[in-house]
Structures are given as C-alpha cells and as structure tokens.
Design a protein with these regions (language model features):
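Short hydrophobic/aromatic beta-strand micro-patches
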Residues: 31-33
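Long, contiguous binding/interaction regions
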Residues: 1-21, 38-42, 49, 54, ...
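Short beta-strand segments
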Residues: 20, 26-29
Length: 106
C-alpha cells in the first residue's frame, strides 16, 4: 500500500531497505523524494491517510509543516520523504546499507 501511494503521488527515487536483523525499531525503511516542500508534505499526508484507512494504529509523523524531511513511523515500516538536497545530505541509504546490498529501488 505504501509503495502504491508513493507512486500515485509521483514520489521519486523510492528505495526500500530491509532492516530485519539490523534494527529493533522497524522491519523496513522506505526512502523517497518529493520535488518541493509542498510535494513532500502532500506525499507524507497521503501515505499517512492510507495507513489509517487500512487500520494501522499509532502512526507518528514528524517534520510537518516544514516539510524538508517528513518521517512517518507506522511501527513495522518507517517512511522518510525528503526534498532532494536534504536526502542527498543525510544519505540514509548509505548509512543503512553500507556493508550489504539490502536497498532496492522500486
């Protein structure tokens, strides 16, 4: 559901990272890019709405209303929506996949 929402909202360069066995706080991380602050916010709100509609409880969202980087924590999956330059600066994909090939572009 998350990936289809990201695709519908025209999020760019979406990558999924398998965190199982690496992290106690989540099983998967999804990293994606929005073209502007407004796009980042719209993408994040659309994903959060979809999670709520499917019955996910306890969703936490950080980064609104600034929308440089919005994090959606749904428990098993964490979604990061970045503006391009912010994503490049933090480079989470490198941080979490440095020694393995667990990042997959979708």
């Amino acid at each position: 559901m998350i990936l289809s929402r990201l695709e519908d909202m025209k999020a760019e360069e979406t990558v999924t990272i398998d965190l199982r066995g690496k992290s106690a706080f989540s099983d998967y991380m999804v990293v994606t890019t929005g073209r502007s602050n407004r796009h980042v916010g719209a993408v994040a709100e659309n994903v959060a709405k979809g999670l709520k509609e499917t019955g996910v409880k306890g969703i936490h969202i950080e980064g609104l209303p600034n929308c440089d980087w919005v994090l959606i924590d749904s428990g098993d999956v964490i979604v990061h929506v970045f503006r391009p330059e912010v994503r490049e600066f933090y480079n989470l994909e490198r941080l979490w996949t440095q020694n393995t090939a667990t990042a997959k572009t979708v």
